[in-house]
């Protein structure tokens, strides 16, 4: 399985959570898909800052090259801080990837305690949005538990988000080892 991680350089902690093979821990700490092949698409700078144009370029690159590389899943662990609508350029671009047959997972964002604060592109009704659920201050909203910083829905368009919540704090994962990266697409 090939998974794309839209990330900053070097490949992020998220790549280790997904595909860490446990080599340095003697197999004790592995990602959820240790046999996965990661394709990292750089859309943020070394400080974690980015522009919409870089995200759109990364998505365009995936659309043009994803099938050739056998990519099946795209993980987007970045999001906008501004409230965007479902018809925004970013949401439309991500939905076009979904429509091309890729599974898209996106972070719910870190905008916190109130409703209607899922960040884009997680507001899309097509993609899978993931929130965090593990804080000392767990919040129960109708049987759905959220971390106090995790973005939560429903979206402004009344789409129930996130679809999935999982641990999101103090997660142990691997780092990319020098010489172990197959390729970096910038």
Predicted regions: what they are:
Residues 38, 59-85, 107:
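Short acidic, glycine-rich surface-loop motifs adjacent to enzyme active sites
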Residues 122-186:
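Extracellular S/T/G-rich loop segment that most often corresponds to the catalytic His/Ser-adjacent loop
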Residues 15-18, 39, 43-45, 74, ...:
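Hydrolase catalytic cores
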Residues 110-126:
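Glycine-rich, charge-decorated loop segments at or immediately adjacent to ligand/cofactor-binding or catalytic sites
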Residues 24, 44-47, 80-83, 110-114, ...:
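Solvent-exposed loop/turn segments at secondary-structure junctions
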Residues 89-104:
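Catalytic-core regions built around general acid/base machinery
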Residues 26-28, 90-94, 114-118, 149-151:
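Short beta-alpha junctions and helix-cap segments that line functional grooves
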Residues 1-53, 67-72, 123-126, 154-161:
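Subtilisin-like serine protease catalytic core
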């Amino acid at each position: 399985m090939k998974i794309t991680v839209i990330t900053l350089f070097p490949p992020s902690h998220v790549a280790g959570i997904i595909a860490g093979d446990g080599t340095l821990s003697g197999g004790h700490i592995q990602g959820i898909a240790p046999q996965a092949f990661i394709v990292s698409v750089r859309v943020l700078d070394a400080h974690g800052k980015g522009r919409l144009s870089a995200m759109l370029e990364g998505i365009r690159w995936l659309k043009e090259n994803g099938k050739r590389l056998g990519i099946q899943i795209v993980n987007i662990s970045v999001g906008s801080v501004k409230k965007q609508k479902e018809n925004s350029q970013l949401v439309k671009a991500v939905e076009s990837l979904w429509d091309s047959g890729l599974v898209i997972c996106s972070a719910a964002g870190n905008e916190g305690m109130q409703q209607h604060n899922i960040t884009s592109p997680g507001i899309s009704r097509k993609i899978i949005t993931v929130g965090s659920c593990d804080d000392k201050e767990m919040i129960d909203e109708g049987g759905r538990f959220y971390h106090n910083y995790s973005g939560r829905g429903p979206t402004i368009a009344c789409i129930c988000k996130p679809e999935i919540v999982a641990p999101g704090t103090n997660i142990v994962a691997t780092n990319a080892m020098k010489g172990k990266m197959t390729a970096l697409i910038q």
